[in-house]
Amino acid sequence: LSSARSFLSQSDYESLVEKANFYGSPLEFTIVGYNSNNRKVGPLMNTKWGQEGGYSALCPNEYPAGCVAIAMAQIEKYHEWPQSFDWSGMANDRPTSASQSLIAMIGKAVNMEYGKDESGASLGDAKRGFEAMGYAVSKKDHDMWDVESEIYFRGRPVYMTGDRKNFIGITWKGHAWVCDGAEEYG
């Protein structure tokens, strides 16, 4: 089991030691299977942007930028498209005037509904916003194969959304995010 330290996380290793001890198995005779064919891609993006903390400085009343705008902005930063933006002027870990301009422009493009506590836009508006900026967009249901395909084979982050529904079917509290990595266990 001690050789498993080279490929297991500390917590996984400790869990195996605990199980081996529980069952009275000598550690030197405990076998751990390892598949070196696991495939991991990502994270593809380096940006760590948020809806507030300076990123919303150019939004109306400095209300939160909205998850739609932040997710779209990070994807656009990854592709550095459209070319009209100062991509080199955008830091990955803090707001700059260039990233603030991009986020505000996306907010306008998606008809962002700004609010004091949260801001939002629909999936349809996000799709039209991407298309207006020169992106080819296809709307699909969440399908892990499609998501992994985009990440593994095309090296592209995936814009995703989810909605929560109450018991009578009224949609509320949607959210948008980017999936920019995946791990496949063989």
What are these regions, as identified by a protein language model?
Residues 88-186:
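Conserved active-site-adjacent core of cysteine acyl-enzyme catalytic domains
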